[in-house]
Amino acid sequence: MDIQQYILNNTGVLLPISGGNGKSQDQAVVIASKATYRLIQVEDDFISAMLDEGYWKKISQSLIFDDDKKYDKITIHHFLDNGDVEQRVFWFDVTECFL
């Protein structure tokens, strides 16, 4: 099952995405060009959909240029229900949004 279908099945939200799970640059979530004007919202919706519990806060966001690709690297703090806090990183290939 691809990542778009996984999120649709779990949340009922259809995001304009493809590609990987966002855990690394090599597995970046590809955001389609039709999301250009709501890029941040799509990224935030994806992060929320991937977290099973608690809430999160964005710590940093960086636009990274790598050859002909553009990536958003987002670092968050994930506040778990048991009181623990995890730092997590999500990668998004936003190249299509800059064409």
What are these regions (language model features)?
Residues 38, 47, 81-85:
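Residue-level signal for the start and early helices of compact helical domains
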Residues 59-99:
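Short, compact, well-ordered microdomains
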Residues 1-46:
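N-terminal trafficking/processing presequences and adjacent post-cleavage segments
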Residues 8, 14-15, 39, 51, ...:
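Generic detector of leucine side chains in alpha-helical contexts
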